[in-house]
């Protein structure tokens, strides 16, 4: 690159900074180097013998965060890294130098998942939050959200084989290419949504149920700061209540736990009490009877607090455009863990800006 071109590039990057490059804010707020110890040693080259030297693992991890923020496919991510100067600067790649292709990005994410390093990085970032003073406090809120995947077109016999727990290779032994494209971990469920509406006589109108195929993201956030502290992934058909123990933490400064009525059961109430946690779970309406006024008022009060977790899912779906393109629950969990990390990083930027602004 000649001197004139280099000067023009420097001038262009300075203009990006002047107008407020959000990636510079992310770089200044999150200590990405802190994750290096969990990332070093992963196979993050292109996988070919005698091929190009491996890319820096921290740069590769930052690329996955960008991918989660924009919900890009691996192929599109390869293009965007080459296309955007601000992204290249954030990832520490040189203009005209080598950048990771889609296979390298996929292989790095798979190794990050298979080695368990991704979960350790999530915990390491939580430690980073605590070090900055964002400890879990004021109780925790639990909820789950459906995340769709591309629908599968299977015969009745194939559907039954999936329900029986058979692997894709067992169902399509003579069609390896087809088996590789089949997700046998995702499940169908009915998503009932919308505001409850009533007839003139006061009886509720039927709710709209929309069939959804995919996975379910279970999370808990701390009430004070709104960071995702615990998370789990299941198929879409898994019952919310059964995941309470997976996502409730005993490390919050308050023992209060908020959740909707799907989490209310004698078993869960007994377990919370055994952990010295106070249940703030919604009460269910008695079958065939009106909801007692006291219970209705208590539920309304709980809803005002519990609604905060809906902002997390809205952020991931509206800003990130969260949708899973990968196959299998292991890769789905990786995608959702990265989305949770990306959300927590955005949340940290929000709190840090508010602290500076007073």
Model-inferred region functions:
Residues 270, 297-358:
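Basic, amphipathic alpha-helical segments enriched in Lys/Arg and hydrophobic/aromatic residues
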Residues 101, 260, 279, 310-312, ...:
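Hydrophobic, well-ordered secondary-structure elements that form the walls
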Residues 75, 79-82, 92-96, 100-274:
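Polybasic low-complexity intrinsically disordered regions
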Residues 1-40, 351-358:
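Charged, often Cys/His-bearing segments associated with DNA-binding zinc-finger transcription factors
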Residues 16, 23-65, 69-70, 104:
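Basic, short loop/linker segments at the boundary and entry of helix-turn-helix/winged-helix-like folds
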Residues 51-55, 258-267, 285-287:
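Acidic, metal-coordinating catalytic cores used for nucleic-acid/nucleotide bond scission
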Residues 242, 267, 288-295:
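Short, charged, surface-exposed secondary-structure boundary motifs
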Residues 275-283:
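Short hydrophobic/aromatic-enriched beta-strand-loop microsegments
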